[in-house]
A protein has these predicted regions:
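C-terminal lobe and adjacent flexible extensions of AdoMet/dcAdoMet transferase-like proteins
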Residues: 163-169
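C-terminal alpha-helical "lid/dimerization" subdomain adjacent to the S-adenosyl-L-methionine
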Residues: 108-163
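A short glycine-rich, Lys/Arg-flanked "PGG" loop and its adjoining helix->strand segment in the class I
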Residues: 93-105
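Class I SAM-dependent methyltransferase SAM/SAH-binding core
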Residues: 15-69
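A short His-aromatic
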Residues: 87-88
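Short glycine-centered segments of the SAM/dcSAM-binding site in methyltransferase folds
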Residues: 15, 107-108
Length: 169
């Protein structure tokens, strides 16, 4: 969560939506930086766990939903995160259309995925090859996002792809 918060420069003016939030670590990281944050996950059990371990409840909301169907109002988010979850999305195009819908003008998107090698199988394939990262960036551009960049970076010792961009103002 800290890497995502740094890469998107999250602060008190932000409303962060984390798609596929799991136990909510990154949602809490956003709240610690003063942002209001919503964790979205398809798993009610994960959301129960996230609620149970969250102390600062006033800045955080948990909702059941998927990337393709975000239960949030139009233009309500300034930042949307997908951290190691895009490879699980059923329909990336539909998910990006939903992200675009919930993002306010100038809103930022960040997707982080573990770097994987072409031809990897099993758990080693959970993530993106360089080509998959570039393909996701191209899809972001095709939905009207600007300043879309693909960066190679590290989350701890793990090499990750960071794809970020924003909506025009």
């Amino acid at each position: 969560g800290r890497l995502a918060a740094e890469l998107t420069d999250v602060g008190p003016a932000d409303v962060v939506v984390h798609i596929g939030c799991g136990a909510g670590n990154a949602v809490r990281a956003a709240a610690r930086r003063g942002a209001r944050a919503t964790g979205v996950d398809p798993s009610a059990a994960m959301l129960r766990m996230a609620r149970a371990v969250t102390r600062r409840r006033n800045a955080v909301t948990w909702v059941e939903g998927s990337a393709e169907s975000l239960p949030l109002p139009d233009g309500s988010a300034t930042v949307v995160w997908a951290l190691a979850t895009v490879h699980h999305w059923r329909d990336v195009g539909a998910a990006l259309a939903e992200i675009r819908r919930v993002l306010a003008p100038s809103g930022r998107i960040l997707a982080l995925e573990k770097q994987t090698q072409p031809g990897a199988t099993g758990r080693a394939s959970h993530g993106w090859t360089a080509q998959q990262a570039e393909s996701f960036a191209a899809l972001c551009r095709s939905t009207g996002m600007v300043e879309v960049e693909v960066k190679s970076t590290h989350a701890g010792r793990r090499a990750v792809w960071a794809v970020g961009g924003r909506l025009p103002s």
